[in-house]
Amino acid sequence: MSNWPYPRIVAHRGGGKLAPENTLASIDVGAKYGHKMIEFDAKLSKDGEIFLLHDDNLERTSNGWGVAGELNWQDLLRVDAGSWYSKMFKGEPLPLLSQVAERCREHGMMANIEIKPTTGTGPLTGKMVALAARELWAGMTPPLLSSFEIDALEAAQQAAPELPRGLLLDEWRDDWRELTARLGCVSIHLNHKLLNKARVMQLKDAGLRILVYTVNKPQRAAELLRWGVDCICTDAIDVIGPNFTAQ
């Protein structure tokens, strides 16, 4: 297998802005638009279940409240993660990573799993997500693991070294070369605003694949692809579709 089997366009948090993020419903919406790869955020419940949620807290994307990682899975099961977005999605639950893997299998979709630890749980979350991903995605294209948290990526590297890893950065770091080498990363995942053509060439010359987020304007997506960016992560999954090209 190539170390980069992934498509050009990735649906951010499953269904971009067209569904409640990080839910099975959002993955179905991404699939409906023909997307072949999704990005989503994974963290641990207090009792060690791996589920999808972006924020530390529940308030923004559910009717729950407080720090999600301080609750047991049975409590998190009661949370409605759909109504905040639309009545159409009322009762949509927080999904387990195992359910997401099954949905990816059904839809033939690849995955970028962002390891999103609750504050202070980086190493444990990195290890648990990597070990689970190895089992759950067996026989499928390996999921691309990424994180802003260095300690989470280190733990993922130790737990499942064969799974591809990407370093996430929201600000440029001059030590990107050393960091990606130490973590054995195949890719670097950057806020697209950090990039110009020269930086893209520099990263590519170092042998890294480049994923950028979150690009919602087709003109910008086309420019980035022309520069040599490998992957565009977008919320505008209807406008920047799975067959989008730089032309």
Swiss-Prot record:
Catalytic activity annotation: a sn-glycero-3-phosphodiester + H2O = an alcohol + sn-glycerol 3-phosphate + H(+)
Q: Which gene encodes it?
A: ugpQ
PROSITE patterns the UniProt entry points to? GP_PDE
Induction field: Up-regulated by low levels of phosphate in the medium.
Summarize the protein's role. Answer: Glycerophosphodiester phosphodiesterase hydrolyzes glycerophosphodiesters into glycerol-3-phosphate (G3P) and the corresponding alcohol.
Q: Active site located where?
A: 12, 54
Q: Which GO terms describe its molecular function?
A: glycerophosphocholine phosphodiesterase activity; glycerophosphodiester phosphodiesterase activity; glycerophosphoinositol glycerophosphodiesterase activity; magnesium ion binding
What's the source species for this entry? Escherichia coli (strain K12)
**Binding sites annotated in the UniProt record for a divalent metal cation:** 39, 41, 114
Q: What else is known?
A: There are 2 isozymes of glycerophosphoryl diester phosphodiesterase in E.coli: a periplasmic isozyme (GlpQ) and a cytosolic isozyme (UgpQ).
Mind telling me which Pfam families this protein's record contains?
Answer: GDPD
What's the domain of life for this entry? Bacteria
What are the record's GO terms for cellular component? cytoplasm
Keywords, alphabetical = Cobalt, Cytoplasm, Glycerol metabolism, Hydrolase, Magnesium, Manganese, Metal-binding
Q: Name the InterPro entries for this protein.
A: GP_PDE_dom, PLC-like_Pdiesterase_TIM-brl
Tell me the protein family, please.
Belongs to the glycerophosphoryl diester phosphodiesterase family.
What protein name does the entry list? Glycerophosphodiester phosphodiesterase, cytoplasmic
